[in-house]
Amino acid sequence: MAAPALGPARGCGAELTLVLLLSLFLLLGWAAGGEEAGPEAGAPSLVGSCGCGNPQRPGAQGSSAAAHRYSREANAPGSVPGGRPSPPTKMVPIPAGVFTMGTDDPQIKQDGEAPARRVAIDAFYMDAYEVSNAEFEKFVNSTGYLTEAEKFGDSFVFEGMLSEQVKSDIQQAVAAAPWWLPVKGANWRHPEGPDSTVLHRPDHPVLHVSWNDAVAYCTWAGKRLPTEAEWEYSCRGGLQNRLFPWGNKLQPKGQHYANIWQGEFPVTNTGEDGFRGTAPVDAFPPNGYGLYNIVGNAWEWTSDWWTVHHSAEETINPKGPPSGKDRVKKGGSYMCHKSYCYRYRCAARSQNTPDSSASNLGFRCAADHLPTTG
């Protein structure tokens, strides 16, 4: 497929421009701490799903243990940690059960977080970790697969992760989110453009994978993408009506439990959780079902088509609408901050076109039974 014409909007509605300007003027400096009950009274409303990670290609249809400590230099270009073990890979059983999906207190109403509804889920298996660069490389080496970012010749990268040399060659940005830049040569092997590499981070989540790429990998591995309901049920880790996989406090006992943005978005990420970009797939404590980084770090694709209209009636193993334009992604990423992209909650959700990719978008797989391969 030919490289897309990179228009200024890239799928984020033009109506967000005024909201963005107002938000950037007012939101910088918000602090997220203590009990997380949503944005403070009188604060500007959060913008829509273009938020922290929704650039699109044009024309496309638990645990109480202390958080793991990793060096801030782990994500620095050229850093090659010595003695780091191979990236972990395993699936964990998710028991059958009934849970409350969504919320009656939506923090981003236009995302369709409401209403709260009872959902029954059959038992299944879920990857304990996001698919890593090393695991995705095995797939590519085995099949010769080319990702859509490689076929298009470009992908979206957060400006703060780019070198000055790469930025100097870019003339366009996403109008409603100018920190997203279309970068030629950006793909899963070169997440921050052609002068970057994943050789020093085999255990970090693979990025710049489209929904179609994720499906191809999961199929090869004898797995599938989780439904949105399965993903959210797994995210909650056996807890009911909690914001995060571990409870309602963002930092229990002052510890970081997810890789998200600290500081002023999009100006400065202080990296207080140990990372300014992605973290290893086994960083931070797992939730009650044994899932690591189920929120933060990298957005994760689900199998569902996007809709913001949900029935309040109880359902069994819902799979979303039969067709649509966008696919659902969950979990937020290292770019999420409460002031702008408060989507590192289990009930939060966003969407993107199936062929879109970005430097904060990855996935993990699910399966009805343990596969014989992968």
From Swiss-Prot:
Catalysed reaction, written as an equation? L-cysteinyl-[sulfatase] + 2 a thiol + O2 = an organic disulfide + 3-oxo-L-alanyl-[sulfatase] + hydrogen sulfide + H2O + H(+)
Q: What is its EC number?
A: 1.8.3.7
Q: Which Gene3D superfamilies match?
A: paralog of FGE (formylglycine-generating enzyme)
Q: Is Oxidoreductase a UniProt keyword of this protein?
A: yes
Where's it found, cell-wise? Endoplasmic reticulum lumen
| Gene Ontology MF, one | formylglycine-generating oxidase activity
Which parts of the sequence are annotated with region: Disordered?
Answer: 57-102
Which positions does UniProt annotate for Ca(2+) 2 binding?
A: 130, 293, 296, 298, 300
Q: How is it modified after translation?
A: N-glycosylated. Contains high-mannose-type oligosaccharides.
Alphabetized SUPFAM superfamilies for the sequence:
C-type lectin-like
Q: How is the cofactor bound?
A: The catalytic copper is required to activate oxygen and catalyze oxidative C-H activation.
Keyword Endoplasmic reticulum in record: yes
EC class (word) = oxidoreductase
The chain's disulfide connectivity reads 50-52, 218-365, 235-346
Alphabetic keyword roster:
Calcium, Copper, Disulfide bond, Endoplasmic reticulum, Glycoprotein, Metal-binding, Oxidoreductase, Signal
Q: Which residues are glycosylated?
A: 141
Output the GO biological process annotations, alphabetical, semicolon-separated. Answer: post-translational protein modification; protein oxidation
Its signal peptide is: 1-33
Per UniProt, Cu(2+) binds at 336, 341
Q: What does this protein do?
A: Oxidase that catalyzes the conversion of cysteine to 3-oxoalanine on target proteins, using molecular oxygen and an unidentified reducing agent. 3-oxoalanine modification, which is also named formylglycine (fGly), occurs in the maturation of arylsulfatases and some alkaline phosphatases that use the hydrated form of 3-oxoalanine as a catalytic nucleophile. Known substrates include GALNS, ARSA, STS and ARSE.
Q: How does it assemble?
A: Monomer, homodimer and heterodimer with SUMF2.
Q: What is this protein called?
A: Formylglycine-generating enzyme
Report the source organism: Bos taurus (Bovine)
Gene name of the encoded protein: SUMF1
